[in-house]
Amino acid sequence: MFTDTINKCAANAARIARLSANNPLGFWVSSAMAGAYVGLGIILIFTLGNLLDPSVRPLVMGATFGIALTLVIIAGSELFTGHTMFLTLGVKAGTISHGQMWAILPQTWLGNLVGSVFVALLYSWGGGSLLPVDTSIVHSVALAKTTAPATVLFFKGALCNWLVCLAIWMAIRTEGTAKFLAIWWCLLAFIASGYEHSVANMTLFALSWFGHHSDAYTLAGIGHNLLWVTLGNTLSGVVFMGLGYWYATPKSERPAPAKINQPEAAANN
């Protein structure tokens, strides 16, 4: 039932591990690209949201954020939140080791951070119409996120990456227009529901930091948010999606590591 999708995810995990080991610069550049792509989506939705009545703002922002994951998937790049699912399935299928997984994840996160801050800098240098005004929702949302309780951030992070990984999972299982609809619906649900995505928050926080933010907005608050949201994102990617679909697949249908390790299987992803 899920064997083919697990095969593709595990083969992608092997590809990620090879890229990280054999071409570290390429891996970091690709990770930075993912952070930048998500950042472009954040700039888009906050530009639109700043103009809208609060009653319709979540729907419009959610309906337009699909560009972020579409760029990550279709253009190709290395996104931390998606890696939590891919690498977990790679470990279970035997295409990578636990050590490789936990070495790659922080590198991906840091690469995403570099790209997120870079695109925020470009926006700031380009005039950044959202940044000079202290009433901009960039600043109010960033402050609210950095002062939220840890438990709220953790569980919103878990719910968020459940949807993001579902979007990626469904994109793997579908073709054509259905692929884009899967991404669109899941990201609409994530943004409109107010969930927390560590990489999306990176750009938002950088945007606010480079602008006219409140004195209550601090680096400690940013670190607080990113810590708990990252942990929540990791929980859902590893447990809900990676382990969830592995154990939802009958043992007799789970892929054999020897089969997945064939070079042609990795090349097909």
From Swiss-Prot:
GO terms for biological process: formate transport; nitrate assimilation. The keyword Cell inner membrane applies. PROSITE patterns: FORMATE_NITRITE_TP_1, FORMATE_NITRITE_TP_2. Gene3D superfamilies: Glycerol uptake facilitator protein. Catalyzes nitrite uptake and nitrite export across the cytoplasmic membrane. PANTHER family: FORMATE TRANSPORTER-RELATED, NITRITE TRANSPORTER NIRC. It comes from the Bacteria. Coiled coil: none annotated. This is Nitrite transporter NirC. It is found in: Cell inner membrane. The gene is nirC. The chain crosses the membrane at residues 30-46, 59-75, 108-125, 154-172, 180-195, 231-250. One of its GO terms (molecular function) is formate transmembrane transporter activity. Pfam families: Form_Nir_trans.
